[in-house]
A protein has these predicted regions:
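Catalytic-core elements of nucleic-acid end-processing and repair enzymes
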Residues: 1-204
Length: 204
């Protein structure tokens, strides 16, 4: 599959857009564009979707920093014994599907993103296709706090100089015949919760 990166976007618009090259922790170089207007941002995102429209779906992720380009699922952040974490997680998921009546009707590929949506740590990454939602997450910092063995997530304004919106390309463009809202590719899977579940499951 051919993935097309956005190059020379600063030359495609009359706006004052700055492009810098950043080397990620993995050694790969990426372009980071400084964009100051929603109009330019919308054009930038649209261009990224356009040049990848044959084999990829481009979605968005708002972040307060780049984290060296690492997109690590919440289940594995700060962890080293990944096999052990995965085994415990698999057992927990199987127990939930078996014992929680509301969830028994849903396949695991749909249940996991739902739980991720409500703050449970899973191997999934949250992505959106709405620029305003991505901007909100880019402008707000999340903080976890544990009280009486319960973990709470608080959001507060990002005080950093820059906020980031990542364009994430997935090759999961083929809709599964037997699973509404589930798309599969060679390297990735994508679950659109708006199609996979009734709306009363989804928080604002």
């Amino acid at each position: 599959l051919m993935l097309y990166r956005i190059n020379n976007f600063e030359k495609k618009t009359p706006s004052d857009i700055v492009c810098e090259t950043t080397t990620l922790k993995c050694g790969q170089e990426v372009n980071v564009y400084t964009i100051e207007s929603v109009h330019d941002l919308t054009q930038f995102i649209g261009f990224g979707k356009y040049i990848n429209n044959k084999q990829h779906n481009v979605l968005l992720r708002g972040q307060t920093q780049l984290y060296d380009g690492a997109l690590i699922p919440s289940l594995y952040r700060g962890r080293t014994r990944l096999d052990s974490i995965t085994q415990k997680y698999d057992k927990k998921m199987n127990d939930i599907r078996k014992n929680v009546k509301s969830f028994t009707q849903y396949e695991r590929i749909i249940l996991e993103p739902l739980l991720q949506h409500y703050g449970i740590k899973t191997p999934f990454i949250d992505l959106v296709d709405n620029v305003w939602v991505a901007l909100w997450f880019a402008l707000h910092q999340a903080k976890c706090k544990t009280i009486n063995s319960h973990e709470y997530i608080y959001y507060y304004d990002n005080d950093r100089e820059y906020s980031y919106i990542l364009l994430v390309a997935t090759d999961a463009v083929t809709l599964c015949d037997d699973k509404s809202g589930v798309y599969e590719g060679v390297e990735t899977k994508l679950v659109d919760l708006r199609k996979a579940l009734p709306s009363y499951f989804l928080r604002p």
